[in-house]
Amino acid sequence: MANQPIILNVYDMYWINEYTSSLGIGVFHSGIQVYGREFAYGGHPYPFSGVFEISPGDSTELGDTFKFKEAIALGSTDFTENDIEKIIEELGKEYKGNAYHLMHKNCNHFSSALSEILCGKEIPRWVNRLAYFSTCVPFLQSCLPKEWLTPAALQSSISQELQDELEEAEDAAASASTSTTAMPRPGRHTKL
């Protein structure tokens, strides 16, 4: 098994950190890098996975409000790339887009959960300090721009998922109409 490094990529969110960092509160997005891929989580209004993948450290894929800040080595893992695909798929069931919450289930919570699975370590506390602060100031989430909750890279994943669902529905409707018009032949058996 490979001993793959686990990297936390941290991104500054917009210009606000110029003002809030002196207060000890930053607004950060994060993702976990492993096997040359970066996995992150963002919110959207649909009941499917909010987990998405970008090129490691590429803030342009996240959108204009993000700027790469730093990469932090968290540890290493012996999970294979195939194992990680399965882990991401399972986490996607828990981290659905419509379950995103700034205080309780955000990108940094996802990064911490994935890091704990892969190398047994949480992310540094300062990365998610805004979530704690938000519990003290509950209206804060409603003051944040929508694009902070749904990164641009996630928008393409959402579009693809919605397109796939539409195609599946069209295929199901087409096969339902075909099966009602086709008469079964007596005496024929189909092997499964």
From Swiss-Prot:
Region annotation (Disordered) ranges: 160-192
Subcellular compartments: Cytoplasm
Coiled coil stretches, renumbered: none
EC number: 3.4.19.12, 3.1.2.22
Chain intervals with Acidic residues compositional bias: 162-171
A biological-process GO annotation: protein deubiquitination
Reactions that this protein is recorded to catalyse: Thiol-dependent hydrolysis of ester, thioester, amide, peptide and isopeptide bonds formed by the C-terminal Gly of ubiquitin (a 76-residue protein attached to proteins as an intracellular targeting signal); S-hexadecanoyl-L-cysteinyl-[protein] + H2O = L-cysteinyl-[protein] + hexadecanoate + H(+)
Domain of life according to the entry: Eukaryota
GO molecular function, a single term: cysteine-type deubiquitinase activity
InterPro entries: PPPDE_dom (IPR008580), PPPDE_sf (IPR042266)
Domain PPPDE: 4-148
Enzyme class label: hydrolase
GO cellular component, one term: cytoplasm
Any Pfam family hit: Peptidase_C97
Residue spans of biased composition, Low complexity class: 172-182
Residues of the active site: H29, C107
Keywords associated with the record: Cytoplasm, Hydrolase, Protease, Ubl conjugation pathway
PANTHER family registered for this protein in UniProt: DESUMOYLATING ISOPEPTIDASE (PTHR12378), DEUBIQUITINASE DESI2 (PTHR12378:SF6)
Protein family membership: Belongs to the DeSI family.
Function in brief: Has deubiquitinating activity towards 'Lys-48'- and 'Lys-63'-linked polyubiquitin chains. Exhibits palmitoyl protein thioesterase (S-depalmitoylation) activity towards synthetic substrates 4-methylumbelliferyl-6-S-palmitoyl-beta-D-glucopyranoside and S-depalmitoylation probe 5 (DPP-5).
Entry protein name: Deubiquitinase DESI2
Lineage summary: Eukaryota, Metazoa, Chordata, Craniata, Vertebrata
Name of the coding gene: desi2
